[in-house]
Swiss-Prot record:
PANTHER family: 1-D-DEOXYXYLULOSE 5-PHOSPHATE SYNTHASE-RELATED, 1-DEOXY-D-XYLULOSE-5-PHOSPHATE SYNTHASE, CHLOROPLASTIC. This is 1-deoxy-D-xylulose-5-phosphate synthase. Pathway: Metabolic intermediate biosynthesis; 1-deoxy-D-xylulose 5-phosphate biosynthesis; 1-deoxy-D-xylulose 5-phosphate from D-glyceraldehyde 3-phosphate and pyruvate: step 1/1. GO terms for molecular function: 1-deoxy-D-xylulose-5-phosphate synthase activity; magnesium ion binding; thiamine pyrophosphate binding. It catalyses: D-glyceraldehyde 3-phosphate + pyruvate + H(+) = 1-deoxy-D-xylulose 5-phosphate + CO2. Mg(2+) binds at residues 147, 177. InterPro entries: Dxylulose-5-P_synthase, THDP-binding, Transketo_C/PFOR_II, Transketolase-like_Pyr-bd, Transketolase_BS, Transketolase_C, Transketolase_CS. Keywords: Isoprene biosynthesis, Magnesium, Metal-binding, Thiamine biosynthesis, Thiamine pyrophosphate, Transferase. Its EC number is 2.2.1.7. NCBIfam families: dxs, PRK05444.2-2. It comes from Ralstonia pickettii (strain 12J).
Amino acid sequence: MTYELLNTIDDPADLRRLDRRQLGPLANELRAFVLDSVSQTGGHLSSNLGTVELTIALHYVFNTPEDRIVWDVGHQSYPHKILTGRRDQMGSLRQLDGISGFPRRSESPYDTFGTAHSSTSISAALGMALGAKTKGEDRVAIAVIGDGAMSAGMAFEAMNNAGVYKDLPLVVVLNDNDMSISPPVGALNRYLARLMSGQFYAATKKGVEKLLSVAPPVLEFAKRFEEHTKGMFVPATMFEEFGFNYIGPIDGHDLESLVPTLQNIRQRAREGGGPQFLHVVTKKGQGYKLAEADPILYHGPGKFNPQEGIKPSGRPAKVTYTQVFGQWLCDMAAADKRLVGITPAMREGSGMVEFEQRFPDRYYDVGIAEQHAVTFAGGLACEGLKPVVAIYSTFLQRGYDQLIHDVALQNLPVVFALDRAGLVGADGATHAGAYDIAYLRCIPNMMVMTPADENECRQLLSTAFAQDCPTAVRYPRGAGTGVTVQPTLEPLPVGKAEVRRTSTAPAGQRVAILAFGSMVAPASAAAERLDATVVNMRFVKPLDVACVLEMARTHDFVVTAEEGCVMGGAGSACLEALAAAGVATPVLQLGLPDRFVDHGDHAALLAQCGLDANGILASIRERFAVQPRAAAPRVA
């Protein structure tokens, strides 16, 4: 497809020079460009196909970047990136040293607020609106929220706060793509949207309220009339009770409705009309039939042929850690009726589809509400059930107070299955599970486990389930190492490490590598070159202190390796144990550096951080001047 209109747009100022009649053809080009780009790089597709018209309308109407747009979650921001000067960079999307798959302030002045976790947009936009007002600057702040993000408490906290500012230039756009819109009613539908957002409706409402102040019976009648007639068209009551002027719902793919509605909203917001709430209904995957039919499959695909769609690779794939968890969950649920599963809106991503199908009465999707999920699990545990919370490592951060106060303080037996621990590749720093070891091991009563492979993941999940205290099992994204997963549900001994390899190096050259979780494999590869001892530590807490001390006393050097932050991590736990015992063996800590690790291929990022086999080898040689075995082949 040729992109005659799209190629003329390098920023929204170019867009605003177009005639309104050109916006429809532009939307077709933009949608085709998104599809073509994502099919070549991988990334979020369905949500971006659904926001094409909305993105065009927002940048066409509002004076961006002076007017601030905040994209909640941010995975629907590709059309925004394309229209704001990054069209020619889309080939580097989510690649190493390329542009991010989410809004990023350092990337563009049009990315007014960095997002990736949900439900933050209204709070950020409220802060921007009040900041502009405080400084006497004339601008509007717009929060675009959808994809279930409105279910989180933070969104309602922000609306509750915003509603007290009656003249605030704040606009909330609810991108409702979770339900289908009724067939359009043509001119009437567009007229009602313009009427509700325009000056006539505002003036009429104000006049009725004035009349009410002098004639209470008339006012009561007027209020009832307004609520009943407006309620025939829009579910406005809840949002208006928060202090917002509600408009909608309108078709989010109909530019003939979107543009004039947003123009009226912008005018009202700038003229002191107070917070505005626009409800638009869009369809995930819009314009690409395969994505419309299965928006979940096309939510975040890898590279694919748009003409053929996503096809199985044909190659036997290694089982993923997520699949191992899903199978274990079903097997343990069949064996123990106390097990209940909880997910904060990540059924597919966390591997709980089969569990929901087989045990629907024991499956709880609480929506995007991590704080609630943790305390809810605590309540279930109080009644003698055994809750398993399946959650991405990065999202458990959102329920940290609840983890401490509502679960650990009461020593409740809740299992936290932490998917996406460590680096996550293309999703980058916002989704990396870099901090869980550090933020979990400092909590009293908490047990923290790090499986080295997919079979051990199953074993440690069983170990966690057998405990009478809160536990966490952290495992990485993607495929395992290829080992056979045994069907057993037997637990492993708590707090016991496993020596995988024993060094035969001479005195002065003896190195012990204490590896946690995913670092066991690269540490083992490096150890072959060095003739080093490798210990699969398994437990961060309780740490196998006896093993740590033995390794330090029988080796010249100790190395700790973890796919988590070095500061406060598992290596720090080992150093604390050595310090407490007065053992002064030199220690090298390897882990994620004290910076946010960007997006890119997972293997490339590990190499960048020195956590692949060659990086581990190089760090040990540099620090301790240990010589590799000459006959060993080079580590791949």
